[in-house]
A protein has these predicted regions:
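Core alpha/beta nucleotide-donor-binding catalytic domains of modification enzymes
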Residues: 2-220
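Non-catalytic alpha-helical coupling and interface elements of nucleotide-dependent molecular machines
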Residues: 131, 195, 199, 222-229, ...
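AMP-forming adenylation/ATP pyrophosphatase catalytic core
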Residues: 1-50, 68-70, 76, 105-110, ...
Length: 341
């Protein structure tokens, strides 16, 4: 949309004043092409440059398209500054006619796997708010650098094809659409938006703490770039892997459709013997999806645990076991997965 067309839309003056910059207009237009959405949505804010840029872009989008959007930030209370930071972000966004609500993670905090557990808790709070407000779309600020970091982390952990391309632009979880419209944006462009529009963003000290795997990977990527590593080449590889993943996913979906039955009344999934007679990767993914479905998990169970239980199911001695919030039982020629309460 041109600057002239944007000026014709009813936009608060404090936001409209930021639309005189041609780079901002170019980034808004790029965002509009990437953000294909019709219904209302919730935006997850952290206070970092990525999420503040997302706050601005989604606000302009919602005004142009007359769509309702709501903004939430999670105060994890992992640092003593976090509550004041959340309140400061709320105050700054409020001055731009962006209403932000703070969600608080109360209770005991972990001493290990802090980032992973905090991420899960953040999504739990946000998904809960989506269900409460009957909004099906949750927008998050992952960008191209996150895509690269995720690829390297998964590769080091020995992930398969699906894991290597797991940061998808859109993912459905418990009927909530998790959407990442910034996945093709460079971090430097998001920092530009945040600085130009808000003249502010939070610098999280944990982003420099090398005790976290993601931070070590980030520094490794920076060093590789100094040695001539090109992001575009890796994005090409990722794109090819995604095509292969889609082909495998087709057969996974066929296996689930033809060889499993969902008993909604009893909240259980019945897997026919043919379910386990497919190529191993198809069985592995189909079974992993089944555990996620019945266990109502956001993240899949670790691959090694899936391997172990599939090995047991293949033996005549298998009776029952628990995994991922599910009870798995063998009954004659079928396997039944039910929710563990």
């Amino acid at each position: 949309m041109s600057l002239k067309n944007l000026n014709a839309i009813k936009i608060p003056k404090i936001l409209k004043d930021k639309l005189s910059n041609r780079k901002i207009i170019k980034l808004i237009n790029f965002f509009d092409k990437e953000f294909d959405i019709k219904g209302n949505f919730i935006v997850a804010i952290s206070g970092g440059p990525d999420s503040l840029a997302l706050a601005f872009l989604t606000k302009i989008f919602s005004l142009k398209n007359k769509i309702s959007c709501k903004y939430f930030i999670v105060d994890h209370k992992l640092r003593k500054e976090s509550t004041n930071e959340a309140k400061n972000v709320k105050r700054i966004l409020s001055s731009f006619n962006i209403k932000l609500e703070i969600l608080t993670w109360n209770g005991k905090k972990p001493s290990k796997n802090i980032q992973s557990i905090a991420r899960k808790k953040r999504y739990d709070l946000l998904f809960s708010k989506c269900r409460q407000l009957k909004i099906e779309n949750l927008i998050v600020g992952h960008h191209s650098d996150d895509l690269l970091e995720n690829f390297f982390i998964r590769m080091i952990r020995g992930s398969g094809l699906k894991g290597l391309v797991s940061l998808e632009k859109k993912k459905v979880f418990n009927q909530i659409n998790l959407i990442r419209p910034l996945i093709k944006f460079d971090k430097k462009d998001l920092e530009f938006i945040s600085n130009y529009v808000f003249n502010f963003f939070i610098k999280d000290p944990s982003n420099e703490d090398t005790k976290y795997t993601r931070i070590r990977i980030r520094k490794l990527i920076n060093e590789l770039q100094k040695e001539g590593f090109e992001k575009d080449k890796l994005f090409l590889t990722l794109n090819n892997l995604k095509k292969s993943n889609l082909a495998v996913s087709f057969y996974v979906n066929e296996n689930k459709r033809l060889n499993s039955f969902l008993d909604r009344d009893k909240n259980r999934l019945i897997l026919d013997k043919s379910f386990f007679r497919q190529p191993y990767e198809i069985v592995f993914r189909s079974f992993s999806d089944s555990i996620k479905l019945i266990g109502q998990r956001y993240n899949a169970v670790r691959g090694k645990k899936i391997d172990n239980i599939l090995d047991k199911i293949g033996k005549n001695s298998f009776n029952s076991e628990t995994l991922g919030g599910c009870i798995i039982k063998k009954a004659h020629q079928t396997v039944i997965i039910s929710k563990e309460y």
